[in-house]
Amino acid sequence: MAALVLLRAGLARPRGVPTALLRGTLLRHSAVLTAAADRSAPARQSHGGAPQGHGSSKAASLHWTSERAVSALLLGLLPAAYLYPGPAVDYSLAAALTLHGHWGLGQVITDYVHGDTPIKVANTGLYVLSAITFTGLCYFNYYDVGICKAVAMLWSI
């Protein structure tokens, strides 16, 4: 579809095809393309979240960058947990795993839950689940052996 839009705008053309040959074809099919674009526009608008603007674009970019940073942090924390187990790595893992899971499940909610009330209920449930997860991992780190030692004990079985 993007190639057709570029062809119609005159920004691209297939190799070896003169522009004069494309003009007649594009003029005949422009009404069909416009009608198809109009039919698909409501579907695109209803699937997205916030309207596209500079503010939402910047926030989305920052959120995406934060997700990648947490994923990269997890890649570094896993070997660190094996090589240097301790409370600092345990609590860092608790925070990073909870945040990574929260953002991942948030994307599942965004993709598969529709309607105002179900979205609010699902997001509230997600925040409760994330808070319980983080609290449980911190409790486990403080009162028990910690995440690193627990994984090492599982590996020794």
Swiss-Prot record:
The chain crosses the membrane at residues 62-83, 89-109, 119-140. Heme b binds at H100. GO terms for cellular component: mitochondrial inner membrane; respiratory chain complex II (succinate dehydrogenase). A ubiquinone binds at Y112. It comes from the Eukaryota. GO terms for biological process: mitochondrial electron transport, succinate to ubiquinone; tricarboxylic acid cycle. Its main location: mitochondrion. Residues 46-61, 110-118 are mitochondrial matrix. InterPro entries: CybS, SQR/QFR_C/D. It is a multi-pass membrane protein. One of its GO terms (molecular function) is metal ion binding. Keywords: Electron transport, Heme, Iron, Membrane, Metal-binding, Mitochondrion, Mitochondrion inner membrane, Transit peptide, Transmembrane, Transmembrane helix, Transport, Tricarboxylic acid cycle. Component of complex II composed of four subunits: the flavoprotein (FP) SDHA, iron-sulfur protein (IP) SDHB, and a cytochrome b560 composed of SDHC and SDHD. Membrane-anchoring subunit of succinate dehydrogenase (SDH) that is involved in complex II of the mitochondrial electron transport chain and is responsible for transferring electrons from succinate to ubiquinone (coenzyme Q). SDH also oxidizes malate to the non-canonical enol form of oxaloacetate, enol-oxaloacetate. Enol-oxaloacetate, which is a potent inhibitor of the succinate dehydrogenase activity, is further isomerized into keto-oxaloacetate. This is Succinate dehydrogenase [ubiquinone] cytochrome b small subunit, mitochondrial. It comes from Gallus gallus (Chicken). The gene is SDHD.
